[in-house]
A protein has these predicted regions:
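Glycine-rich loop(s) and the adjacent beta-strand/alpha-helix scaffold that form part
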Residues: 118-173
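Short beta-strand segments that buttress and anchor functional surface loops
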Residues: 97-102
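Conserved N-terminal/central alpha/beta ligand/cofactor-binding core
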Residues: 6-93, 134, 143, 158-164
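Core beta-strand elements of the Rossmann-like FAD/NAD(P) dinucleotide-binding domain
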Residues: 106-115
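Conserved small/polar residues in nucleotide/adenosyl-binding loops
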Residues: 176-177
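N-terminal Rossmann-like FAD-binding beta1-loop-alpha1 element of flavoenzymes
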Residues: 1-2
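Flexible, active-site-proximal loop/turn residues at the rims of small-molecule/cofactor binding pockets
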Residues: 20, 104, 122
């Protein structure tokens, strides 16, 4: 059994309708624009279903597909609009509990478990647990990565963005306001 805690109202992170970045993965690793690369597994399953059901590329439809995938898995409990804000440790090396709060229904959650994965994007669980972390992009010399940037090649942190697009589908479409 897993509990998926998401601090936003939709799943997908940067690929959600809130941010609207497309799922790239291997197809654009380090900006190489490899048109022959393709993600496999669950990502491929989601992308194929999105292509089939969402010919216009509406980001809200992708949100729905992601939500359906989670609901189809009986061993996942989903907590949307719920942010982890603190942790408890069983010992100096072991997280035993996370504390979360849902802003939509003012509910506090105390979640116990044996394994926790921080995929929040901001690393709150890892930070509260005292894990080592870094901010920004590491230079090539840090890990001897061939395609990593030299210092100063791009910004150290991601900026904010707003993204609009339009598409002539050749037929009437729903207008979201």
């Amino acid at each position: 059994t897993a509990i998926l805690v998401q601090d936003r109202p939709v799943l997908g992170g940067n690929a959600s309708s809130e941010v609207r970045l497309w799922i790239l993965g291997a197809t654009s690793h380090m900006g190489n624009n490899n048109r022959w690369s393709r993600e496999g597994g669950l990502v491929d399953e989601i992308l194929i279903e999105n292509l089939y059901r969402n010919k216009e590329g509406n980001p809200v439809i992708l949100d729905t597909i992601l939500l359906e995938k989670v609901y189809q898995e009986p061993n996942i409990t989903l907590l949307l609009n719920t942010a982890v804000w603190d942790i408890e440790k069983a010992d100096p090396q072991t997280v035993s509990k996370v504390y979360a709060f849902c802003s939509q229904n003012s509910t506090f959650y105390e979640i116990s478990g044996r394994l926790f994965c921080d995929a929040s994007g901001d690393g709150i669980l890892a930070y509260r647990a005292g894990a080592a972390f870094r901010m920004g992009a590491e230079e090539k010399r840090c890990y001897n990565e061939q395609f990593a940037p030299d210092k100063g090649e791009f910004g150290e942190l991601l900026g904010h963005s707003i993204y609009f697009y339009s598409l002539d589908t050749g037929k009437p479409c729903l207008l979201y306001t």
